[in-house]
Amino acid sequence: LQEKSCTDFQLAVDDYLIRHRSILDVLTKHQEAAARVNRAVAKAVTECGCISIVAERQKIPADAEFNNLKAFMSSHLSGELCENCRDVLINELGHSLFYLTALCNLTGLDLQAVLQHETKNVRTLGIFNLS
């Protein structure tokens, strides 16, 4: 997100988060929203079938070099989201982002600063970040 978009979104969330303003509400709503993201992906697989999951052990050649590992790693995802499933997933990701931003607001964190901090960490740590 660009800085102005982050700021605008954070201000909008602050303006419109009224009913579930308690930190406990925000934490549980964020968790619920994350579960709905997972469910949207699962439904795209099991009900629509526009995508499928073909999971197996990652096949990495013994002589593969560390800096080339990404080329051998699979997402286990096959196909592309149809328009309907894409819309559902975008909607659910939006709700998740809404409550993540609400959590930032209630704890006094700037969403843009969080994104910049994490971007710096990812770039600094490279492939060792969250691996």
Describe these PLM feature segments.
Residues 1-93, 97-131:
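Flexible "arm" and connector segments at domain edges
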